[in-house]
């Protein structure tokens, strides 16, 4: 419990100092890239994903795997989460002995803080702006779970810091969203330094159809690959289903359960 409190405090400190993606990282956002959209206050989310190997750092995975994560939104501005990504030794090429039967998981924290809401202060042109961090610390024998050495090829596989902005526009056909972000990390095996941009479209014709709440189509460049896909919301926004073609050819998909605690 003490280690958890230390790690959680470190995460909040990092959020106040630094500006990872998103459905595939079990948090709010687009497919691979972050956005500045937020969940309602008190929203608890459970996310499960299938991830192709091209979505994963090469130093940890040479195979496709699964991940699951939890997140909670406070005060409509702060989202914190915890994500686990499965290691499967039987899928490592040439693995023998103990390595072949190893079944473990990588664990990391994430956090996002919305510093500006869309249209805040009565300014209709104002975009929403979010600062975020994913996998900010790693474990070591001397420092517990507060070691900040997350660069290179070691632990801290999913490390990223980012700032994202989002603006929505209503049209006669549906809602259009424009998303810009800048991401930074110190990884050698998962290099995402640079700008990211995305466009979303939620057609009005697919809103509020039986149990279907909406379908949001997404095209994005996440600073590494160009991705397309969609996120469908059903049953009064309790469930979301995600399908993605990373680099327009590699498949990721996921399912999310959302619970309002307020």
Locations of regions flagged by a protein language model:
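Outer membrane beta-barrel transmembrane domains
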Residues: 193-244, 254-256
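A generic structural motif
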Residues: 75-77, 225, 248-250
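Cleavable N-terminal export/targeting peptides
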Residues: 1-27, 262
């Amino acid at each position: 419990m003490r280690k958890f409190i230390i790690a959680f405090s470190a995460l909040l400190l990092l959020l106040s100092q630094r500006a990872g993606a998103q459905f595939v990282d079990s948090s709010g956002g687009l497919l691979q890239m972050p956005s500045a959209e937020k969940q309602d206050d008190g929203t608890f989310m459970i996310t499960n994903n299938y991830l192709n190997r091209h979505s994963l750092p090469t130093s940890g995975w040479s195979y496709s795997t699964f991940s699951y994560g939890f997140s909670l939104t406070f005060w409509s501005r702060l989202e914190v989460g915890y994500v686990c990504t499965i290691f499967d030794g039987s899928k490592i090429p040439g693995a023998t002995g103990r390595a072949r039967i190893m079944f473990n998981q990588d664990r990391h924290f994430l956090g996002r803080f919305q510093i500006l809401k869309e249209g805040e202060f009565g300014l209709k042109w104002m975009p929403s702006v979010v600062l975020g961090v994913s996998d900010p610390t790693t474990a070591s024998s001397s420092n517990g779970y507060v070691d900040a050495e997350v660069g290179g090829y070691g632990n801290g596989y999913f490390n990223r810091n980012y700032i994202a902005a989002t603006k929505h526009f209503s049209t006669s056909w549906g809602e259009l969203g424009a998303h810009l972000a800048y991401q930074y990390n110190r990884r050698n095996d998962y290099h995402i330094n640079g700008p990211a941009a995305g466009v979303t479209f939620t057609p009005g014709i697919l809103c509020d159809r039986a149990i279907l709440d909406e379908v949001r189509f997404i095209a994005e460049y996440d600073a590494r690959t160009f991705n397309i896909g969609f996120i469908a919301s059903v049953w009064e926004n309790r469930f979301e289903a995600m399908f993605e073609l990373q680099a327009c050819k590699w498949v990721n998909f996921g399912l999310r359960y959302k619970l309002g605690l307020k």
